[in-house]
Swiss-Prot record, chain B:
Keyword check for Hydrolase: no
Annotated protein name in UniProt: Methanethiol oxidase
General function of this protein: Catalyzes the oxidation of methanethiol.
Record GO cellular component, one term: periplasmic space
Reactions listed under catalytic activity: methanethiol + O2 + H2O = hydrogen sulfide + formaldehyde + H2O2 + H(+)
Species, as recorded: Ruegeria pomeroyi (strain ATCC 700808 / DSM 15171 / DSS-3)
Gene (UniProt): mtoX
Pathway the protein contributes to: Organosulfur degradation
Entry EC no(s): 1.8.3.4
Species classification: Bacteria, Pseudomonadati, Pseudomonadota, Alphaproteobacteria, Rhodobacterales
Highest taxon of source: Bacteria
Length: 236, 436
């Protein structure tokens, strides 16, 4: 009888535990679909984004490998950083002042980064990479300082991982720029650097699936493309 | 770091894909590639070789336009590419460092480096596998740059050499990416035929309005017609049926066709305006000699309608190239058969009207204008087998000054006299575009 009572008691405790787990375990909030709903339309883009998964993203070319440095000065292979997650990659230099240049790229990344807080779980699949093409001035110390608002964000854990990277010099930088097709041009005074604003969408396998330039930097389109890739992976 | 708010962008900058569109291209140095708002320094002329003339090869000819230059108005360089390919059109890469050109007969694509020395382009790469890569597309015609890739329109196919064709996308390294076959009545691919439109599957030009995510393509004819002798074709009733009658609206981002408009008589060049609220495009029909407007209506739907005649359509002047002014107020329209250029006031795009005309020569095809509209350039060749014969076969580049009232000739380059060949598409170059 005691055994049966004990067994019943254990069963009751187990059942209560299960119920308790269901009550107390945080249920992940639903992610909006399409994900682009987290953004409002802007005057710059006067259209509705296509439905995610209603089109295919071509394999444009293989994203190149290269040696990069993170904000701690640790060297990584770019392929190691991009493999395994869908990556949005941008190229900037941190002393850029043209409003339609690097600050625009950064603004779009900040928008996507902030919005990712409302896209639970997306950070398991997607990340942001910003790579400097001015290693002389964008040293490890400089990118660490630049990245501070990102790394010190209290909600960083809920948002997309955003790595700010540099290189040790032109020799390491050149194959990355050439491989991506990121055109950079230094003027004779070496102070000003011209480049074409480009963002690259790289899939988990390391293929560039889309390239965005000025006029295409609608964050709704970026998220639609990301969602399309996720659906492709899921076999939808 | 503070995020910055951005208002409307000059997204229209990339809308048309014309060379001086690159001016407003993105930059961290304003501007990376400055628009040639001042003086264009060079003009590159993609030229067809002629049997028995000079080296008989297709070539990229460079003419000096620099004021005060000892060689202004003269050919200063020429790059021959081997053979006669039916050289036709070309387009710059989005970074404007390379000029992609096509041969409509051999389907070879020649990519020139125009940034290392803008006065002296060099052949950088040749693509010999266009037909095989694309799965049977023939006749690489328009080269429209997108970030990271080049969208090329076909004119024909290697199955029946008729007008059914596709768009073909390559990456900036010249590697094949994808083929998008034009919608046909049998396979609309989700597109809707508007009114009487019958999707013929034909292609010709491509232009986009990025702000609206709209891409438009037009329709011409296939290899069996464009390589046929013009006079012979005019007598061939069956051949004359094989011309395009459609403009297709596409979703630019997804590359999917959305609408097929009935635009009878072979609509050719398409041009979007520059204005940030200008939601329309023009095209002209070669056989029916009409100016067409493709526009967004009040309900946000795109429509197409004829808005003017060009000359007397019964004469079949054969409108060919067009050029829209930077201020969207005027449109040059050339007509091949009467050798005329006509200027239309398009300040109200729904009610355009002609305000000027001039005979350029016995035949005329291409027209390009400077950013300020004060200099207008014309060239002669349409197709090797369609150009006029004998003394009417004038082959040239002619430069004019336009003061708002009259075109006054500045200089002329006789391409036959110099043993070069048939002058076709023109595109401007400038060393100011590149810092290093």
């Amino acid at each position: 009888m005691r055994k049966r009572f004990l067994l019943s008691g254990l069963t009751l405790v187990a059942a209560a535990t299960v119920v308790g787990w269901q009550v107390w375990s945080p249920v992940p909030p639903a992610r909006p679909s399409p994900m682009s709903l987290v953004f409002e339309a802007s005057d710059a883009y006067q259209f509705d984004p296509p439905a995610p998964g209603s089109y295919r993203l071509n394999r444009i070319k293989r994203a190149p490998d290269g040696r990069v440095l993170d904000i701690a000065g640790t060297e990584h292979s770019l392929h190691d950083l991009t493999r395994g997650k869908i990556s949005l990659v941008s190229f900037v230099y941190l002393t850029c002042g043209d409003v339609n240049g690097c600050p625009l790229a950064m603004s779009v990344f900040f928008d996507v980064h902030d919005a990712s807080g409302d896209l639970p779980g997306l950070n398991e699949d997607v990340q942001l990479l910003t790579i400097s093409f001015d290693p002389a001035r964008d040293t490890v110390e400089a990118i660490e300082a630049f990245a501070y608002p990102i790394t010190s964000d209290e909600q960083a854990g809920d948002k997309l991982n955003w790595q700010v990277l540099t290189t040790s010099g032109p020799q390491e930088l050149r194959p990355i720029l050439d491989g991506y097709g990121q055109v950079v041009d230094r003027s004779e005074d070496q102070e000003t650097i011209s480049h074409l604003l480009r963002l690259f969408l790289v899939d988990r396998q390391g293929d560039i699936r889309n390239v965005y330039g000025l006029g295409f930097l609608d964050p709704r389109l970026l998220l639609t493309d990301i969602e399309t890739l996720l659906m492709e992976e899921a076999g939808a | 770091m503070k995020r910055r708010e951005f208002g409307a962008l000059a997204a229209g900058a990339l809308a048309m894909g014309l060379p001086f569109r690159a001016f407003a291209d993105e930059t961290c140095q304003s501007p990376y590639m400055p628009k040639i708002t001042g003086q264009e320094e060079f003009v590159y002329v993609w030229t067809l070789g002629v049997e028995g003339m000079g080296d008989e090869q297709d070539k990229l000819v460079t003419i000096d336009l620099r004021p005060g230059s000892a060689t202004r108005g003269q050919v200063i360089n020429s790059v021959s590419v081997g053979g006669r390919n039916e050289a036709h059109h070309g387009g710059f890469s989005a970074d404007r460092r390379f000029f992609w050109t096509g041969g409509l007969d051999t389907n070879r694509i020649f990519i020139f480096d125009v940034h290392s020395d803008p006065s002296n382009p060099k052949l950088h790469k040749t693509i010999d596998t266009f037909v095989k890569d694309s799965g049977g597309v023939v006749g690489p015609h328009t080269f429209f740059a997108l970030p990271g890739s080049m969208m090329i329109t076909g004119l024909s196919n290697d199955d029946d050499h008729g007008g059914r064709t596709a768009l073909v996308e390559y990456n900036d390294d010249g590697e094949y990416v994808a083929t998008y076959w034009m919608p046909t009545a049998d396979d609309m691919q989700g597109a809707v035929a508007v009114g009487d439109a019958v999707a013929d599957g034909y292609g010709y030009d491509i232009r986009a309005l990025i702000r609206k995510n709209v891409m438009l393509t037009s329709s011409f004819t296939g290899w069996s017609n464009y390589m046929m002798d013009f006079g012979q074709m005019l007598q061939d009733a069956e051949a004359m049926k094989r011309f395009g009658n459609t403009i297709v609206q596409w979703d630019l981002h997804t590359r999917q066709p959305k609408k097929v408009f009935n635009v009878p008589g072979a609509p050719l060049e398409i041009r979007f305006p520059w204005g940030s609220n200008a939601n329309y495009a023009f095209s002209t029909t070669a056989l029916t000699s009409q100016l067409w407007l493709i526009y967004e209506d009040d309900a946000g739907e795109w429509q197409a309608k004829a808005v003017a005649d060009i000359g007397n359509p019964a004469d079949i002047p054969l409108p060919v190239d067009i050029s829209i002014a930077a201020d969207d107020q005027t449109l040059w329209i050339n007509s091949f058969m009467d050798g005329k250029t006509r200027l239309f006031d398009i300040s109200d795009p729904h009610k355009p009207f002609q305000i000027y005309e001039k005979v350029i020569d016995r035949q005329v095809n291409m027209v390009s204008q400077s950013w300020d509209g004060k200099r207008v350039y014309f060239s002669s060749s349409l197709l090797a087998n369609w150009d006029k014969k004998g003394k009417d076969d004038a082959q040239y580049l002619k430069a004019y000054n336009w003061d708002g009232k009259e075109l006054v000739e500045d200089f002329a380059v006789d391409f036959y006299e110099l043993g070069l060949g048939r002058a076709h598409i023109m595109r401007f170059g400038s060393s100011a575009l590149y810092s290093s």
